[in-house]
């Protein structure tokens, strides 16, 4: 289902354990390209976290308290389902290395083929 308005939305998924300056920079770059950035904190109960989920959520919300175009949510399940739920046109990702790029490229191709969402 398309968005109800002409607003462009991107999701930025991750565990954000911890949320770093690099993550903050990616969100700010996303705001230059999209009307809204939804940060999705993935809740993977099988992974051991350094910081509790509630603490990560609160820290990220505080970091963007000045920016009404950023929303922060916790989600479970597939990232692509989270993107579809929010009518996102794109998934925002950061790449740190060649290995990251290869992994992200494969995921991006699957997202595009299965759901038509760019990464």
Predicted regions and their residues:
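Nucleotidyltransferase catalytic core that binds NTPs
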Residues: 2-119
